Amino acid sequence: MTEETHPDDDSYIVRVKAVVMTRDDSSGGWFPQEGGGISRVGVCKVMHPEGNGRSGFLIHGERQKDKLVVLECYVRKDLVYTKANPTFHHWKVDNRKFGLTFQSPADARAFDRGVRKAIEDLIEGSTTSSSTIHNEAELGDDDVFTTATDSSSNSSQKREQPTRTISSPTSCEHRRIYTLGHLHDSYPTDHYHLDQPMPRPYRQVSFPDDDEEIVRINPREKIWMTGYEDYRHAPVRGKYPDPSEDADSSYVRFAKGEVPKHDYNYPYVDSSDFGLGEDPKGRGGSVIKTQPSRGKSRRRKEDGERSRCVYCRDMFNHEENRRGHCQDAPDSVRTCIRRVSCMWCADSMLYHCMSDPEGDYTDPCSCDTSDEKFCLRWMALIALSFLAPCMCCYLPLRACYHCGVMCRCCGGKHKAAA
């Protein structure tokens, strides 16, 4: 790297909160980078300096408290990505190792999909804007893979920044030597390429007696999701569309100078069900002047009440929340099966005898024949079952457990976040 890089917020395909970890080969462990602290880590698209229209992807991490860039790693085709556990992932490029400790399994899954999508685009050679992640049905977690922005910035300040030109993706490095300025600071114009189209102006259609409303012809939406904390703000949408929407979106604005406030007069009847009070002087037939309250949204009536799960951070419907819907939720039946069958013996053996240098090992009962230690692992498990015969009960018990999950009798349930 020969210059400071500050990727444009609009260039991120995924951005989450995590602690950047570094590998210490001497002790064989992972330690927080630069003293630790929560960082905003994302996968962003960057342009090659040759100006040939080709793009690459950069994993960029910036610590929140002091804006220090603690991680910069270019995504390459030979990147080896490992999911050690639901909240800790690490990868290796050119004998350099990087790790992230996420705040939730949902953030970890989102970041994993972002890295895999970047690698697929590099392999296919298609890293244009059409290949960024906008297909919610393909990727899941529909509140993550969209245009991301920093949650600390003012959402009312809309700005357009061109794509930043940085060095070619030839190395990965932890940044240690400088602190970035404020997000809204201007940058020298000679380091940028103007490749974003100007927003298309709206067509103004005025009517004298209608309220102001916006009719959106293109139903595709862009939701801002910047990380773990934004689930509190996810349902909040702006009244007007973002001017930075792509040029394919068409809008028609119906506006007028002043929106009138409607008052409704209802005659008061003693036998009615309004129950809004009586005339202070006791006279009947008084007029009640009120503004009718808005009913619940049509979506809430049709789909039921939706909340975010405290375990997996996914949205769920309270009416459809049954056992087996949340894989990250604690399940007493699954825990009991592992304790009764003494599976901790198998885990201990695999950890000490068949784990990789990172301490990761394959699931004891995995049937993946591509594993180079497939036969050795099963022979060791069979030998261990003679010392702990109760391990033989694990497979039939797990089969019964899966049947119970299919019947919604077992498994974890979503729990609404407070």
Swiss-Prot record:
The keyword Protease does not apply. The keyword Nucleotide-binding does not apply. Expressed in liver, skin, small intestine, salivary gland and prostate. GO terms for biological process: negative regulation of epithelial to mesenchymal transition; negative regulation of ERK1 and ERK2 cascade; negative regulation of intracellular signal transduction; negative regulation of lens fiber cell differentiation; negative regulation of MAPK cascade; negative regulation of transforming growth factor beta receptor signaling pathway; positive regulation of DNA damage response, signal transduction by p53 class mediator. Changing Y311F: No effect on phosphorylation or ubiquitination. Changing Y264F: No effect on phosphorylation or ubiquitination. It is found in: Cell membrane; Cytoplasmic vesicle, Secretory vesicle membrane; Cytoplasm. GO terms for cellular component: cytosol; plasma membrane; transport vesicle membrane. Residues 146-156 have a biased composition (Polar residues). Changing Y240F: No effect on phosphorylation or ubiquitination. Pfam families: Sprouty, WH1. Residues 308-416 form the SPR domain. Residues 201-257 form the KBD domain. Changing L100P: In NS14; results in loss of MAPK down-regulation; increased protein degradation; properly targeted to the cell membrane; loss of interaction with NF1. It is linked to Noonan syndrome 14: A form of Noonan syndrome, a disease characterized by short stature, facial dysmorphic features such as hypertelorism, a downward eyeslant and low-set posteriorly rotated ears, and a high incidence of congenital heart defects and hypertrophic cardiomyopathy. Other features can include a short neck with webbing or redundancy of skin, deafness, motor delay, variable intellectual deficits, multiple skeletal defects, cryptorchidism, and bleeding diathesis. NS14 inheritance is autosomal recessive. This is Sprouty-related, EVH1 domain-containing protein 2. The gene is SPRED2.
